[in-house]
A protein has these predicted regions:
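N-terminal Rossmann/SDR dinucleotide-binding element
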Residues: 1-76
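Glycine-rich Rossmann NAD(P)(H)-binding loop
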Residues: 6, 174-180, 201-212, 233-246, ...
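NAD(P)H-binding glycine-rich loop region in Rossmannoid oxidoreductase-like domains
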Residues: 56-103
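Conserved Rossmann-fold NAD(P)-dependent oxidoreductase catalytic core, especially the SDR/UDP-sugar
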Residues: 80-82, 106-146
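Active-site helix of classical SDR
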Residues: 146, 150-153
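NAD(P)-dependent short-chain dehydrogenase/reductase
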Residues: 159-210, 214-222, 254-255
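Mid/C-terminal beta-alpha module of Rossmann-like enzyme folds, strongest
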Residues: 190, 196, 220, 227-275
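Conserved C-terminal active-site "lid" loop/helix of NAD(P)H-dependent oxidoreductases
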Residues: 214, 248, 269-303
Length: 310
């Protein structure tokens, strides 16, 4: 397929583009900045440079912008993968929901009008398990944050205009991915602590979450993407699921796998969690069959260890 992909500088975007390209698809990636060098030398910049080698990059080309629309006017696109989202201060209570939604959906009507010229084209939107109503869990499935609200609103807007334009829509809902090329989050904290010989302190061990290898998530994304243009029911959704367990148990799983591969002690302590600012349970609902996708769990653990081994 000829694929146009937004949001390729992100951790999951990098993995999705990599696996789409490996599957033989022609991928055009769009970036908001004017060059790969403009993303710097941190892990995000490294991802951008690697993505640029695996795809055909379009710089200074945000979703819905004039260059973006011009590309759609002149090129045949079979699948538009809208993975980009405004994540500015996404963990902050002051996150600007309205601004984020506007950025995420700018020009969406014109985008879909141009996309619909190919009668077999589809839109694949990335969602988050942190949106209100997504996945399964506790407390009535509220949004985790203003960012989660913005993602749900983005999905609603895209669904409305896809119906109006007659463009099939797929929603791929992401849980908690981890793996090589990740940003500094929970898994990264544990791995850095253990590589330094420190005892990791887990402050929220009681939260039940859905952690999944990025390599497995990406294969699930490719399978979903390949099936989407052939859909005739207008809308499809998948909520891929990995390791469903409390964060303390996931830390134990990670520690066991890394002890086998690194020689580190991988010590950690779980605090007694008394505050629950987020829903206690939030998980996805569609377990991914890695064997059917040709995925090797042991290899995935090996590559994670290699990524963090000096």
């Amino acid at each position: 397929m000829n694929i146009l992909f937004t949001g390729a500088s992100s951790f999951t975007g990098y993995w999705f583009v990599t696996k789409l390209a490996e599957a033989g698809h022609e991928v055009r990636t769009t970036f908001t900045r004017d060059s790969a060098e403009a993303y710097g030398d941190d892990v995000r910049g490294q991802r951008v440079r690697r993505v640029a080698e695996r795809s055909k990059p379009l710089f200074s080309c945000p979703f819905g912008s004039a260059p973006f629309l011009e590309y759609l006017k002149n090129e045949r696109v079979d699948l538009l993968c809208h993975h980009a989202a405004d994540v500015t201060d996404y963990k902050s209570p002051a996150f600007d929901i309205c601004s984020a939604v506007a950025n995420n959906t700018r020009g969406v009507q014109e985008v879909l009008k141009l996309l619909s010229r190919n009668s077999k084209a589809a839109l694949l939107l990335t969602g988050s398990v942190f949106e209100g109503g997504e996945g399964a869990g506790s407390e009535g499935l509220p949004a985790f944050s203003p960012y989660g609200v913005s993602k749900a609103a983005t999905a609603d807007i895209c669904a409305y205009y896809c119906r109006a334009a007659g463009v099939p829509l797929g929603k791929f809902v992401i849980p908690n991915p981890f793996g090589p090329w990740e940003d500094a989050r929970f898994t990264g904290y544990l791995m850095r602590a253990w590589s330094n010989g420190d005892v990791a302190n887990i402050r929220t061990p009681a939260y039940v979450r859905d952690n999944i290898h990025a390599s497995l998530l990406a294969l699930a994304y490719v399978a979903f993407a390949e099936a989407l243009p052939a859909t005739n029911d207008g809308f499809r959704r998948t909520n891929p699921s990995g390791y469903v367990e409390c964060q303390g148990a996931f830390a134990g799983r990670l520690a066991q796998e890394m002890r086998l591969r690194t020689g580190w002690e991988c010590r950690f302590e779980c605090a007694r969690q008394t505050e629950f600012d987020e829903p206690r349970i939030r998980i996805n609902t569609d377990p991914v069959n890695g064997v059917a996708l040709g995925w090797d769990e042991a290899v995935a653990w090996n590559k994670l260890a290699q990524w963090y081994t000096p």
